């Protein structure tokens, strides 16, 4: 009887352990070892740096012009034109 109980407990332990390992691999491994995610994060970071540089250049040009916009919008439609 003791041998049957021990083997049954061992079998249940192995099943539970297997389920835990499969569950943890499904969640943790893609996050830890995904090179695609790292590449996407590096591209996003590079894009943010480029946008910051562009914005700083635009702000510098605008400050040099005294805060005036570079282009002037037209006054509107011509009254003589239909």
Swiss-Prot record:
Residues 1-26 form the signal peptide. InterPro entries: CLAVATA3-CLE. Keywords: Developmental protein, Differentiation, Glycoprotein, Hydroxylation, Secreted, Signal. The keyword ATP-binding does not apply. The keyword Transmembrane helix does not apply. Glycans are attached at residue 77. One of its GO terms (cellular component) is extracellular region. The modification Hydroxyproline is found at residues 74, 77. It comes from the Eukaryota. GO terms for biological process: cell differentiation. PANTHER family: CLAVATA3/ESR (CLE)-RELATED PROTEIN 7, CLAVATA3_ESR (CLE)-RELATED PROTEIN 53. Roots of plants overexpressing CLE53 exhibit normal growth, but reduced levels of colonization by arbuscular mycorrhizal (AM) fungi. Roots of plants silencing CLE53 exhibit normal growth, but reduced levels of colonization by arbuscular mycorrhizal (AM) fungi. Belongs to the CLV3/ESR signal peptide family. This is CLAVATA3/ESR (CLE)-related protein 53.
